[in-house]
Amino acid sequence: MTFTAKTLARLIAPFALTLGVVADGAAQTAPLTLQVYNADVNSFHVNAVLVSGKTDAVLLDTGFTRADALRIVAMVLDSKKVLKTIYISQSDPDYYFGIDVLKQYFPDAQVVTTAPTLKKIEATLATKLQVWGPRMGANAPKTVPLPTALEGNTITLEGEKLEIKGLESQPHRSYVWIPSIKTIAGGVNVYGGLHLWTADAQTAQERADWSKKLGDMIALQPTCVIAGHSLPGTKQDVSQVQWSRAYLARFETELPKAANSAELITALKTAYPDAGLMIALEIGAKVNNGEMKW
């Protein structure tokens, strides 16, 4: 069988967990529509978002594994839109390891990110490949083409703006605000039904800045919020931001009371018994108790 783009879309599309987030009847009038690829636990439930206009589209992030990236390719192909831009929202590899696969199928799409995120990727890429490459095997990227730095803080899609916000503090942890459809793509700031990845927020100030960023999102009064990581079926609304902010507050309360990571893990598991992504809690507890370097 000849392996073509159409074949790829037909074979992989059933596995791409996409979610239309425009309300019933609104798709005919909304200037932009959204589809979400939600990866499984092996890829930390990371999300990629396809933002579509009438003819063109912007992709927010590319997935972690090659398999994730191929499923995202299928989602784009099935949309029948012209992919103009791939925006890398975060410096974590589960947001950008799929660049090489996406570029194979959409060579004309520009791959961009903010200057702070690019700087962080450049500083950590070699280590990330060293850590994850052997674990991922054939699912690891063959190459990782670097994105280019975005000029300004907006991406325009058919006249509608996608605004990059949260650049004031920890600018590599930004988020995307789409005012025309009152939607936030929260990146690593927002989790849905999962333990937060606190290993990258090792000081009280970093966590306070993170919490403030979540407060800024709430103030925008979004009608739709797409978390950077979420359990399947999680509501795509501001409750995910509230969940993340409450979790951070609880983490801050429990951390000084815990004598070690085991006690902190127990406290957070008790507070959030149904939360997924235990690896985030286990590593975050060890790092923030000084038992592990990250």
Label each PLM-derived region with a short phrase.
Residues 23-29:
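Boundary at the C-terminal end of the N-terminal hydrophobic targeting segment
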Residues 67-113:
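Active-site metal-binding motif and surrounding structural segment of the metallo-beta-lactamase
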Residues 10-20:
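Bacterial N-terminal signal peptides
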Residues 1-7:
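N-terminal secretory signal peptides that target proteins for export/translocation
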Residues 22, 120, 219-224, 232-294:
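Accessory terminal helices/loops
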Residues 29-78, 175-178, 182-188:
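Conserved beta-strand hairpin/beta-sheet module of binuclear metal-dependent hydrolase folds
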Residues 64-65, 120-243, 247-250:
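Metallo-beta-lactamase
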